[in-house]
């Protein structure tokens, strides 16, 4: 598996921004990415569930960051994407949520994969 890694401003490398990280699919995906040694920026609407997930992953030695994000806000998305090479989105519904995320990824030049299970 090819590893995507970006280091910016002396911060820890963040490989993947995972939108919807605290959801059913997101938690499983975050765990799999962590097992593979990727640093995951866990992102979603509410900080509490993201921090809970980060603690669980950290107990297994995973490197994570937590970021709240509003996908309807371009500035919020741009901030969450800073320094990542790939955005994985598990948020839905796709028809309503994907457009702003795709636009932000195109603007930032970041790769995008939608994995919403709707």
Task: Locate predicted features.
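Rossmann-fold cofactor-recognition segment
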Residues: 57-73
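N-terminal Rossmann NAD(P)H-binding glycine-rich loop of SDR-like oxidoreductase domains
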Residues: 16-33
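Conserved Rossmann-fold cofactor-binding substructure of NAD(P)-dependent oxidoreductases
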Residues: 68-86, 90-93
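ADP-ribose/adenylate-binding Rossmann-like module
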Residues: 104-118
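Glycine-rich phosphate-binding loop and adjoining beta1-alpha1-beta2 segment
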Residues: 48-56
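A short, basic/flexible loop-to-alpha-helix module at the beginning of a structural domain
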Residues: 1-13
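N-terminal Rossmann-fold cofactor-binding loop
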Residues: 43-47, 71
